[in-house]
Amino acid sequence: MRQILVAVTVALVVSILLTPALIRLFTRHGFGQEIREDGPPSHHNKRGTPSMGGVAIVAGIWAGYLGTHLAGLAFDGEGVSASGVLVLGLATALGGVGFLDDLIKIRRSRNLGLNKTAKTVGQITAAVLFGVLVLQFRNGAGLTPASADLSYVREIATVTLAPALFVLFCMVIVSAWSNAVNFTDGLDGLAAGSMAMVTAAYVLITFWQYRNACVTAPGLGCYNVRDPLDLTLIAAATVGACIGFLWWNAAPAKVFMGDTGSLALGGVIAGLSVTSRTEILAVVLGSLFVAEITSVVLQILAFRTTGRRVFRMAPFHHHFELAGWAETTVIIRFWLLTAIACGLGVVLFYGEWLATIGA
């Protein structure tokens, strides 16, 4: 528990202190956000708001994770794990793709950065490397950071993917989650606040896996997760980093996370879901992100097949704005829905454990 508190605190402090420094730096160099011309009229006054604040989020997560391990050395704590480094490596790689995208937008003074092909190639490259490496690094108990079995709350032994299919599966998961968080990041604080809740749920889930790991507590309901405590630290650090950033990103936002932050945070969800064996459960926890990307897909499909739109504008948080909802109303209501989804996900997780032990 002490390690979790250290991870949250260090990440929060780094994020909340680094963000205003970045705001001053980006403002001085004119690194401001460009706004879609076809977006809601109320968003036009946001043009020029400093972007790429996701740098503070990524830095906060790394600081929280590494700082906890450095502090742990004084108490005979374990070093970093393969699972932890791979999840953060994935998030950082995706954040790098987002950083290039943000930088190009700023340099060209338009809301279009990397072209779709270049952005997709970057995401797929990160996903392939993650998918290949996450099945390596077998520990003394014979566990790798991920399992080739499809998983809900734990592995579904009847659905085992061949290595090539598993890598393809990782490509889908990583691309889907990174784009989903990216689409959600359209209102002040929406993505950061929602992400804090999802990763808070993962703190509970992975810590429970740690307390009931088959390596240390074999028996009914135990979990074959390689490094559950390290995943808890990553989730906790993400909570702290998002809250620290939210202090400056809440409406009216003084800074945006940009693709730097949204793609990296999507990588955190993807990485945690794969390494904690909860790929399907993650869909429940992050159902807001799922709904946002689904609204974009539906909008595109409907327009291409019928010439009509399902929503006034996609992602669908803009639909409610154009319907007359105030931006803060949309944000708070979506946060409430995220909290409900996370609560439901934790209940499903715990309920599965109770059913497994026959309680």
UniProtKB/Swiss-Prot annotation:
Cofactor(s) needed for function: Mg(2+)
Enzyme class: transferase
Record key words, sorted: Cell cycle, Cell division, Cell membrane, Cell shape, Cell wall biogenesis/degradation, Magnesium, Membrane, Metal-binding, Peptidoglycan synthesis, Transferase, Transmembrane, Transmembrane helix
Membrane-protein topology: Multi-pass membrane protein
Keyword Lyase: no
PROSITE patterns: MRAY_1, MRAY_2
Family: Belongs to the glycosyltransferase 4 family. MraY subfamily.
EC number: 2.7.8.13
Pathway(s) annotated for this protein in UniProt: Cell wall biogenesis; peptidoglycan biosynthesis
Pfam families assigned to the protein according to its UniProt record, in alphabetical order: Glycos_transf_4, MraY_sig1
Annotated source species: Mycobacterium leprae (strain Br4923)
Superkingdom of this protein's organism: Bacteria
UniProt KW Cell cycle keyword: yes
TM annotation in the entry: 3-23, 55-75, 80-100, 117-137, 156-176, 187-207, 231-251, 255-275, 280-300, 334-354
GO terms under cellular component: plasma membrane
Record protein name field: Phospho-N-acetylmuramoyl-pentapeptide-transferase
HAMAP family registered for this protein in UniProt: MraY (MF_00038)
Catalytic activity annotation: UDP-N-acetyl-alpha-D-muramoyl-L-alanyl-gamma-D-glutamyl-meso-2,6-diaminopimeloyl-D-alanyl-D-alanine + di-trans,octa-cis-undecaprenyl phosphate = di-trans,octa-cis-undecaprenyl diphospho-N-acetyl-alpha-D-muramoyl-L-alanyl-D-glutamyl-meso-2,6-diaminopimeloyl-D-alanyl-D-alanine + UMP
Function: Catalyzes the initial step of the lipid cycle reactions in the biosynthesis of the cell wall peptidoglycan: transfers peptidoglycan precursor phospho-MurNAc-pentapeptide from UDP-MurNAc-pentapeptide onto the lipid carrier undecaprenyl phosphate, yielding undecaprenyl-pyrophosphoryl-MurNAc-pentapeptide, known as lipid I.
Any GO BP annotation: cell division
MF term (GO), any: metal ion binding
Subcellular location: Cell membrane
